């Protein structure tokens, strides 16, 4: 039976040791970040010299190196990012994993043959998104961690030529990647900029905002670690071409252990003998690091069991219970034996409120073993209560085995050396001439003394090869020597041969430096040209252009209820964006249509806001609303392109992550009639984004609570341990207004949307009134207010912003009417706080 083709196994590395660990244990490719522009800004990075070594180590073993360039790039950073990528390409990387759409386009212009992969931060989770990736010309995309096997099969069938990659192991972001703004909101450490503060790993209280009642408490949005070993066969059959292990910040021992485990599982897939792994087979993968394991969402939502709940960090493996304490020894019953130097934790029974304890095991005695249960006595420094759970946080033997697996790998890897070719010519009485070439470089050197008749050893190929081959620590290695042009029976002192070699190397190095400087200058000019020429063919929105012609500052109010839409219209909004998907239940289509007609009579446009996440199963509900034929606002880049191609008026929302003008140009090229830049940009950065269009076609969010996270998981469902998506009475009747309260007392509203996803909103509304003059001065003419929480003062805030915009348009100031409404319960957002 022929072997089945299996996906590439992609391992993480944050250090050279981790690169060695990965390739030694069977990784087909390794992804790592260099010191700039990647999504791990706190230590999991290689220097450029280390990156070159990583490429050498990997390539010697037949593995590839992928560079993570997976953050959003600010306007001023684009030239630096492209130049830095060039330096990394020079070091030998095979591909780059990129998030920023504008950067992808620039890479294709500057490095047209280079391989580009789309990061999971691009939030590709359906056919429409995958089609845009194919249109962009990328080679592969990393799918959202939330995709099911059914989703993947549908994407594979619809876009057969796009490479697909998916995560199989490691830490899980609770939010859809690319859609987490919560860290940046709280601490200015943006997940989209590589500085995530891990807001999801904090403990929270879930409260009913109406009654104040506590509904749940703990690490409520801290996901367990992914371990998709049971699904490997099905993932491969679904058409995934690459399986990715998360963990660039993990230790080399983790990389070695997990890579080896999945390499062995994939060998079974290849042979056609795969069966779900046993406890013994997966135990090392869980033991090396685990917050608890989940199979992820390949089979659908898991509900309460998806979350760690009790602790956010490495827990290890639960082995058994404490049965006694005698003469300084803890007595335990465990289902796997404990050894000396193992790290142990002891936890109170479920529901207990005492703190856990732990220590490294001292002397261990096995008292008995029967039916897979070991009774052991462990020397301890203090008593541990009977009935407490025994957890092994680290296993000494496993760590030693992992270290041994890569101890000798890549230690001799040397810097890449360029092959030299030497052609020698000479006759009696004339100097020896050597033409030395290295790639496109060529030098000619001559001896300072003439060739003479040999009285002892004559000059021959072996001697020439020996002397010209002594290249030591130079960046060259002798590959070929041709001495056919040297007459026989001649002599030249060895010191003269050495001088010629040294002179050739010195001249080659000078030429190489000149060539490198010239290449860098050429590359720099190419980069400058590419960055300066922003998609000249990109169209601007005709409706927005018309607005600009009147010089009116247009006010857009985004709401989720019909009554709020009508309040905004009455208070002076020029356009209303309705998000009927934000919360259960939907408004009726007939009621929305009637409101739309009333708005039209008042000269107000009604625009439909789509969800950013539209899984295949959700599409039927969305299509019902799209049938209304309204203009659309969408943060789903795939939908922007699909609807624009069908002739719809579509504005790209902030979830499209427009961080620079080149991304804006690509969104316009996809058909967007307008673009809302990221809510993580400062006023000055927004000005840079909109400058090529003079502000025309752009809309800025100036008030309200942006969505901080989009979760496939539902915290309310988990609190009551209901079957996922079968509990709408909780969010529609029992607890329609809930908040997550963090340890500092900040409350984050939770909106449970049409597909039972949670959208976590910022704890306080942004107020950008003081920045209106500068934004208007940049040419921006559309300003959006977000009203997405019960109790929002829609009419008052809309009226205050109408007054502020009219004041700015008249050359005055925006006034303080909005601040008077808010008091001190607001934030200036990122208008003056860079991420």
Name the predicted role of every residue range.
Residues 124-126, 227-228:
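Active-site glycine-rich loop that binds ribose-phosphate moieties when present
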Residues 1-24, 29-40, 55, 61-71, ...:
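Surface-exposed amphipathic alpha-helical tracts and adjacent flexible/coil segments at the periphery
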Residues 111:
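Conserved phosphotransfer cores of two-component systems
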Residues 46-52:
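Glycine-rich, highly charged phosphate/nucleotide-binding loops
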Residues 108:
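Short glycine-biased active-site loop of nucleotidyltransferases that positions the nucleotide triphosphate
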């Amino acid at each position: 039976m022929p072997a089945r083709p299996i996906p590439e196994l992609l391992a993480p590395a944050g250090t050279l040791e981790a690169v060695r660990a990965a390739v030694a244990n069977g990784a087909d490719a390794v992804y790592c970040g260099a010191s700039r522009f990647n999504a791990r800004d706190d230590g999991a990075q290689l220097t450029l010299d280390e990156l070159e070594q990583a490429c050498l180590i990997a390539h010697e073993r037949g593995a590839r190196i992928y560079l993570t360039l997976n953050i959003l790039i600010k306007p001023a950073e684009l030239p630096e990012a492209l130049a830095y990528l060039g330096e990394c390409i020079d070091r030998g990387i095979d591909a780059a994993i990129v998030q920023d759409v504008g950067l992808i386009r620039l890479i294709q212009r500057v490095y047209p043959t280079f391989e580009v992969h789309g990061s999971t931060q691009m939030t590709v989770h359906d056919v429409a998104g995958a089609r845009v990736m194919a249109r962009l010309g990328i080679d592969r995309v990393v799918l959202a961690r939330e995709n099911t096997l059914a989703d993947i099969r549908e994407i594979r069938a619809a876009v057969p030529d796009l490479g697909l990659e998916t995560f199989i192991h490691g830490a899980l972001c609770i939010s859809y990647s690319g859609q987490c703004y919560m860290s940046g909101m709280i601490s200015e450490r943006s997940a989209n900029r590589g500085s995530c503060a891990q807001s999801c790993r904090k403990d929270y209280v879930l409260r009913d905002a109406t009654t104040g009642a506590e509904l749940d408490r703990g690490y409520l949005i801290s996901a367990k670690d992914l371990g998709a070993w049971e699904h490997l066969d099905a993932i491969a059959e679904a058409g995934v071409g690459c399986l990715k292990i998360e963990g660039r910040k993990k230790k080399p021992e983790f990389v070695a252990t997990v890579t080896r485990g999945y390499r062995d599982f994939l060998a079974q897939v290849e042979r056609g003998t795969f069966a779900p792994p046993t406890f013994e087979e997966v135990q090392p993968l869980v033991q090396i690091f685990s917050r608890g394991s989940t199979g992820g969402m390949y089979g659908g939502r898991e509900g309460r069991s998806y979350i760690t709940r009790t602790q956010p960090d490495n827990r290890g493996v639960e082995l058994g219970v404490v049965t006694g304490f005698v003469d300084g020894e803890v007595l335990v019953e465990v289902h796997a034996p404990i050894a000396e130097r193992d790290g142990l934790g002891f936890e109170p029974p479920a529901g207990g409120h005492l703190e856990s304890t732990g220590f490294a095991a001292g002397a261990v005695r096995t008292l008995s073993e029967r039916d897979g249960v070991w009774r052991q006595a462990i020397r301890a420094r203090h008593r541990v209560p009977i009935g407490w759970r025994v957890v092994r946080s680290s296993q000494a033997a496993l760590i030693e085995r992992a270290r041994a697996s890569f101890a000798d790998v890549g230690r001799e890897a040397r810097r890449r050396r360029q092959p030299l070719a030497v052609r020698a010519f000479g006759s009696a009485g004339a100097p020896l001439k050597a033409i030395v070439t290295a790639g496109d470089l060529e030098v000619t050197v001559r001896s300072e003394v003439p060739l003479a008749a040999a009285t002892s050893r004559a000059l021959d190929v072996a001697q020439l090869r020996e002397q010209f081959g002594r290249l030591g620590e130079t960046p060259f290695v002798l590959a070929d020597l041709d001495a056919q042009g040297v007459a026989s029976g001649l002599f030249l002192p060895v010191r003269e041969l050495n001088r010629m070699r040294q002179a050739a190397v010195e001249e080659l190095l000078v030429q190489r430096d000149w060539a490198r400087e010239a290449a860098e200058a050429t590359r720099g000019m190419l980069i400058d040209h590419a960055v300066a020429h922003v998609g000249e063919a990109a169209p601007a929105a005709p409706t927005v252009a018309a607005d600009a012609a009147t010089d009116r500052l247009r006010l857009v109010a985004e709401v989720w209820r019909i009554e709020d839409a009508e309040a905004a219209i009455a208070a002076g909004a020029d356009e209303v964006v309705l998000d009927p998907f934000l919360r259960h239940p939907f408004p009726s289509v007939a009621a929305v249509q009637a409101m739309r007609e009333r708005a039209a009579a008042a000269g107000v446009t009604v625009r439909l806001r789509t969800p950013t996440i539209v899984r295949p199963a959700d599409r039927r509900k969305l299509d019902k609303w799209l049938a209304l034929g309204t203009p659309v606002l969408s943060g789903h880049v795939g939908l922007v392109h699909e609807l624009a191609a069908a002739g719809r008026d579509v504005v790209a929302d902030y979830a499209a992550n427009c961080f620079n003008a080149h991304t804006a140009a690509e969104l316009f090229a996809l058909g967007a009639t307008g673009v809302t830049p990221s809510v993580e940009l400062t006023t000055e950065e927004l000005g840079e984004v909109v400058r090529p269009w003079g502000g025309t076609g752009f809309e800025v969010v100036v008030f309200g609570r942006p969505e901080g996270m989009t979760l496939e998981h539902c915290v309310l469902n988990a609190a009551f341990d209901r079957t996922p998506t079968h509990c709408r009475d909780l969010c529609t009747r029992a607890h329609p207004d809930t908040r997550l309260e963090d340890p500092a007392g900040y409350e984050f509203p939770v909106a449970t949307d049409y597909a039972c996803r949670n959208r976590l909103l910022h704890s306080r509304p942004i107020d950008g009134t003081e920045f209106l003059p500068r934004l208007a001065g940049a040419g921006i003419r559309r300003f959006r207010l977000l009203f997405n929480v019960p109790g929002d003062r829609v009419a008052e805030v809309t009226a205050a912003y109408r007054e502020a915009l009219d004041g700015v348009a008249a050359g005055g100031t925006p006034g303080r009417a909005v601040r008077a409404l808010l008091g001190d319960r607001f934030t200036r957002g990122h208008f003056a706080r860079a991420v």
